[in-house]
Amino acid sequence: MQLPRWWELGDPCAWTGQGRGTRRMSPATTGTFLLTVYSIFSKVHSDRNVYPSAGVLFVHVLEREYFKGEFPPYPKPGEISNDPITFNTNLMGYPDRPGWLRYIQRTPYSDGVLYGSPTAENVGKPTIIEITAYNRRTFETARHNLIINIMSAEDFPLPYQAEFFIKNMNVEEMLASEVLGDFLGAVKNVWQPERLNAINITSALDRGGRVPLPINDLKEGVYVMVGADVPFSSCLREVENPQNQLRCSQEMEPVITCDKKFRTQFYIDWCKISLVDKTKQVSTYQEVIRGEGILPDGGEYKPPSDSLKSRDYYTDFLITLAVPSAVALVLFLILAYIMCCRREGVEKRNMQTPDIQLVHHSAIQKSTKELRDMSKNREIAWPLSTLPVFHPVTGEIIPPLHTDNYDSTNMPLMQTQQNLPHQTQIPQQQTTGKWYP
């Protein structure tokens, strides 16, 4: 382990000597040196013991200042460092923490918090939590053990338990001792119990809540369960009356007379309050009838033989292929009969059609064919609206028409087409006689 150099521990003027090898430290410097060495070794090798009670909220803060002195180079007395530090916590010998213990740390520049409600099953059993601190700037690590000795609590569990949902708090804010103390004080003024304990604190995100938007300083919300030894007060019972239940179903705030005692610091959602009376709960535990511990005789065990009997799969193979093939063949024959043998044919259709209808349709088809042939052979000018920028026959570029030089109101529609150069002329119809295409 790297220790501070001796001339950095005190004032150089405090050293005296009569020559080389005869230097002495003053009493003040000696005390500072021993205190520094003791603090370094005690922080690295010491374990902390805590004694929470079963069924009572346990909170342990992992202070960054406590671990800063464990990362080399060790700071001098009075030196301030603000390195980012994160923590990893797990049960000794296991990759994670016990089920009742939670951990939260918002940023590497804030303290971590271990919190939870110890269970009665772990009473008398020391729970060793390994805490590993990581310095994100120097990549140094430091390890510390937290020994949790769970003690049995009196009157565990408390018979009357109430769970409140506080909308304007995050879980790490609620875990602060002064904030939690203020909330318990407000509950005590409303409930008036002789014994009041915080049982558990749960973030709303762990109950399926949504992450709030980063606007208007919105909070996640936190559930706080408290227990007392006296029945619920009339103020807490007001949530159960029909009027308030109806308002909650309509997403309206219920009318609670004691809400003003919390409103100064805590915004409570009274529609989500839960009141549990342990004295009225029916126990579903059934007494276990212990027997002799001997299983009933099921006869002699006969394991299967080593040599398995061979099985012929030829019949199964034929059935698997023959049945689908036969069905497919029948369907094919039915389809072939319908397509080939049940067709009318053109001759049968013409025989059943009257002659005048056949002549009418044949004339229409003949006229249609003649029109198509004529449309292929005719040579007429294209309309101006479809003229390209070049001539469709010669490929020469046609100059654009400037309509400003002409009086478009008096100009015939076909005059422009007749005056265009290289324009194909429309054949004129003869005035005398008949003309056939």
Swiss-Prot record:
The keyword Transmembrane helix applies. One of its GO terms (cellular component) is dystrophin-associated glycoprotein complex. The chain crosses the membrane at residues 318-338. SMART domains: CADG. It is found in: Cell membrane, Sarcolemma; Cytoplasm, Cytoskeleton; Cell projection, Dendrite; Golgi apparatus. N-glycosylated. Ubiquitinated, leading to its degradation by the proteasome. Changing residue 60 to R: In DYT11; affects protein stability; the mutant undergoes endoplasmic reticulum-associated degradation. Residues 1-317 are extracellular. It comes from the Eukaryota. Glycans are attached at residue 200. It is a single-pass membrane protein. Changing residue 271 to Y: In DYT11; affects protein stability; the mutant undergoes endoplasmic reticulum-associated degradation. Changing residue 60 to P: In DYT11; affects protein stability; the mutant undergoes endoplasmic reticulum-associated degradation. Keywords: Cell membrane, Cell projection, Cytoplasm, Cytoskeleton, Disease variant, Dystonia, Glycoprotein, Golgi apparatus, Membrane, Transmembrane, Transmembrane helix, Ubl conjugation. Changing residue 270 to R: In DYT11; affects protein stability; the mutant undergoes endoplasmic reticulum-associated degradation. Ubiquitous. Residues 339-437 are cytoplasmic. Component of the sarcoglycan complex, a subcomplex of the dystrophin-glycoprotein complex which forms a link between the F-actin cytoskeleton and the extracellular matrix. Belongs to the sarcoglycan alpha/epsilon family. It is linked to Dystonia 11, myoclonic: A myoclonic dystonia. Dystonia is defined by the presence of sustained involuntary muscle contractions, often leading to abnormal postures. DYT11 is characterized by involuntary lightning jerks and dystonic movements and postures alleviated by alcohol. Inheritance is autosomal dominant. The age of onset, pattern of body involvement, presence of myoclonus and response to alcohol are all variable. This is Epsilon-sarcoglycan. It comes from Homo sapiens. The gene is SGCE.
